[in-house]
Amino acid sequence: MGRAYQNRKLSMAKTAGAKTKVYSKYGKAIYVCAKTGGIDPDGNLSLRGLIDRAKKDQVPTHVIDNAIKKASGAGGEDFVEARYEGYGPGNCMVIIDCLTDNGNRTIKDVRQCFSKNHAKIGTSGSVSHMFDHQAVFAFKGEDDEAVLETLMMADIDVTDVELEDGIITVYAPHTEFFKIKTEFTNSMPEYELEIEELSWVPQNYIDVEGEENLENFEKFIAMLDDCDDVQHVYHNAEIKD
């Protein structure tokens, strides 16, 4: 699972849009998180985690601060979460999470991404039952057994720990995210976390093969990434080098 998870992250990184678009998506997510859960990161752990990820992705401090400041005021924009599921090129499964202030616009944009790339949008729950909501941490290291032992000694429920190509990947139920992050900070500070996120991890992967499918897949992901309302795309496609 670990290598495939890294491949998925890489495929998203390859098609990432301009930095300003990435900043905009983080700004929107931080605004919504602060608006709904409070502007103090110490009291809003979800906000704290989101800010940490934004900084790791080199989002400027002023973008983060402006989003929180905006959330602290009265009124403001109303965003709602929207999720779409379906089958992408090569019959891979896809989950798309959005934040939108105009549901009609968002579904129109997402449908267009599917229809233009030989993909098929599905109904709610059509593929999400084939994904697990997981806390995922990845970092350079060699002693995966020691990492597992440390986490278990801290009474943390760990789904799996994998070591491949010098990268250790920890998977755990999403409810364990902040316990694991705290344990790394307190007990394993020598590890620099390259990935620390809540993700929908597929239970199995599918190879996307054939030149046409590969081209459509890359275009599909790029079009979704270009949609302003799309926050996250999860899929079970594995792309061979």
From Swiss-Prot:
Keyword check for tRNA processing, yes or no.
Answer: no
Listed GO CC annotations: cytosol
Please provide the record's keywords in A-Z order: Cytoplasm, DNA-binding, Transcription, Transcription regulation
Q: Entry's Gene3D superfamilies?
A: 1.10.10.200, 3.30.70.980
**For this protein, what is any one GO molecular function term?**
DNA binding
Q: Which domain of life is it from?
A: Bacteria
Does this entry carry the keyword RNA-binding?
no
**SUPFAM superfamilies linked to this entry:** YebC-like
Q: Which PANTHER family match?
A: TRANSLATIONAL ACTIVATOR OF CYTOCHROME C OXIDASE 1
Q: Which HAMAP family match?
A: Transcrip_reg_TACO1
Q: Into which family does the record put it? A: Belongs to the TACO1 family.
The protein, known as = Probable transcriptional regulatory protein CPS_4169
